């Protein structure tokens, strides 16, 4: 597991967005000047964990109708089943309070998940879904036919989308930002928030300082669970905010579906290698000095991950040149190839595998290690920059391979490496700066999924991060023990 210390937290001062096309394998970064960050707006006295859940499938979800903040749709039977699965997933978790949107589809989901808990439920109208004005109630094809260019802008440039004199996404970001003081001021350590797709995106983005340009970059599926940690600083300033996990769904995150209404043409699956010998759960203990093999728990992690990936036909595996990553990738490739021979058609499935030196962060840590107990933010500036530059090269190389003309539509690439490497790749995907590495947390054996609905030359969509449900009894609980 990788997390950053509280003494010198790394926070995003500015967020960046890249052009949709890479030129000469070098992305141009455009500065987003956004006031969406909460960093200067509040403090917390104790650590707070906020768990966000999107409502289950609604009747209008099923029909493909634009809901917005209307309150006509209700949960389908599938939606109620999804909410029940989420209830079971969260049944042993400790919550002090539940905030929810009062719209029927969200309210019903919250009631199912909350179950027999005696703690209070707070209905907050500001947690309603995005206001879409004249779009609301239309089938998506009707919106395209009736509104033409406006509907195209909603699909392609939602941050600047305007309808009926309103900018819905900008209004949503402002409303989400205004929700946080009330949520965090509540005397509770663990908060459940049940709301909607777009408003949950806005809550996540405003918490970690991302602007409206990131709308549809952090996927929120029906009954998907996301977790934010707000950790007080010793100096009493604004808290360190960390996205512990994103979009943990009732079913497998590899089960398909769309990203923001679009089918992913290609995917990158980030697999944190199985736990190695001497690895501590909170720090990289001795990893800088030892090329560790996996311990028995790490072997179990890898086997569980390989089983999960049987839902997909993996095209290629790229891994760090370190032993634990090589071992994990070997387990995945062997299971993939064996499954091909055991299939109905009995067709051998060859998985292309390779090692990539740029995925090796241990060598960077080793150069900076002085006491065999290295945490990322304790790196000196030179080593920190070297780690970031290496991850940028790795990300560009991965995109180049995925963009290869010889690659097939729907290609799935699995990338195996340590948690810090994958945190860096997620930040690269979102085109953030190196100061944003403290925004994310990954555990050993977890997977994170990046979709490319418009191809790898365009913006990636984070489908989920730090998914561990496939690890069974070794999975990481949603909330911390009471």
Swiss-Prot record:
Chain segment of the transit peptide: 1-34
Gene Ontology MF term list: 2-carboxy-D-arabinitol-1-phosphatase activity
Record-level GO cellular component terms: chloroplast; chloroplast stroma
Predominant subcellular localization, coarse grouping: plastid
Location of the protein in the cell: Plastid, Chloroplast stroma
Family matches, as SUPFAM superfamilies: Phosphoglycerate mutase-like (SSF53254)
Keywords: Chloroplast, Hydrolase, Plastid, Transit peptide
Cross-referenced PROSITE patterns: PG_MUTASE
Active site: 55, 129
Catalytic activity field: 2-carboxy-D-arabinitol 1-phosphate + H2O = 2-carboxy-D-arabinitol + phosphate
Enzyme class: hydrolase
Pfam families linked: His_Phos_1
Record-listed E.C. numbers: 3.1.3.63
Protein family: Belongs to the phosphoglycerate mutase family.
Function: Phosphoglycerate mutase-like protein lacking PGM activity, but having 2-carboxy-D-arabinitol 1-phosphate (CA1P) phosphatase activity. Prevents the accumulation of D-glycero-2,3-pentodiulose-1,5-bisphosphate (PDBP) a potent inhibitor of ribulose-1,5-bisphosphate carboxylase (RuBisCO). PDBP is produced during the oxidation of ribulose-1,5-bisphosphate, the substrate of RuBisCO.
The protein, known as: Probable 2-carboxy-D-arabinitol-1-phosphatase
């Amino acid at each position: 597991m990788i997390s950053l210390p509280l003494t010198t937290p790394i926070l995003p001062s500015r967020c960046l967005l890249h052009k949709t096309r890479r030129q000469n394998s070098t992305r141009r970064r455009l500065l987003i000047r956004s006031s969406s960050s909460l960093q200067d707006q509040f403090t917390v006295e104790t650590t707070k964990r906020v768990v966000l859940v999107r409502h289950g499938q609604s009747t209008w979800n099923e029909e493909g109708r634009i809901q917005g903040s209307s309150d006509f749709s209700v949960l389908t039977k599938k939606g109620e089943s999804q909410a029940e699965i989420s209830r079971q997933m969260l049944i042993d978790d400790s919550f002090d309070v539940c905030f929810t949107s009062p719209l029927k589809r969200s309210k019903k989901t919250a009631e199912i998940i909350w179950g027999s808990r005696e703690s209070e439920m707070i209905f907050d109208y500001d947690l309603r879904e995005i206001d879409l004005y004249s779009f609301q109630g239309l089938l998506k094809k009707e919106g395209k036919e009736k509104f033409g260019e406006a509907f195209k802008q909603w699909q392609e440039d939602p941050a600047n989308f305007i309808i009926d004199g309103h900018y819905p996404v900008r209004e949503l970001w402002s409303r989400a930002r205004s929700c946080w003081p009330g949520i965090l001021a509540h005397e509770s350590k663990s908060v459940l928030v049940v709301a909607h797709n777009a408003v949950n995106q806005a809550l996540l983005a405003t918490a970690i300082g991302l602007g409206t340009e990131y709308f549809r970059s952090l996927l929120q599926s029906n009954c998907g669970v996301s977790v934010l940690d707000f950790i007080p600083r010793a100096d009493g300033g604004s808290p360190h905010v960390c996205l512990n996990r994103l979009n943990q769904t009732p079913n497998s995150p590899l089960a398909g579906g769309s990203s923001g209404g679009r089918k992913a043409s290609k995917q990158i699956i980030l697999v944190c290698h199985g736990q190695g010998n001497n690895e501590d759960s909170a720090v990289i203990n001795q990893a800088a000095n030892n090329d560790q093999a996996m311990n028995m728990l790490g072997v179990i992690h890898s086997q569980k991950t390989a089983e999960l990936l049987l839902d997909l036909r993996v095209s290629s595996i790229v891994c760090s040149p370190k032993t634990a990553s090589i071992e994990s990738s070997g387990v995945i490739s062997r299971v993939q190839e064996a499954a091909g021979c055991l299939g109905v058609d009995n067709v051998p499935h060859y998985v292309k595998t390779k090692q990539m030196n740029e995925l090796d962060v241990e060598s960077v840590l080793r150069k900076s290690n002085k006491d065999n107990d290295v945490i990322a933010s304790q790196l000196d500036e030179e080593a920190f920059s070297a780690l970031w530059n290496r991850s940028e090269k790795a990300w560009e190389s991965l995109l180049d391979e995925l963009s290869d003309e010889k690659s097939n539509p729907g290609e799935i690439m699995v990338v195996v490496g340590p948690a810090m490497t994958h945190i860096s790749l997620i930040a690269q995907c979102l085109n953030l700066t190196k100061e944003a590495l403290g925004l994310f947390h990954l555990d050993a054996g977890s997977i994170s999924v990046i979709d490319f609905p418009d191809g790898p030359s365009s913006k990636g969509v984070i489908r989920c991060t730090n998914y561990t449900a496939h690890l069974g009894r070794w999975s990481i609980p949603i909330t911390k023990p009471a």
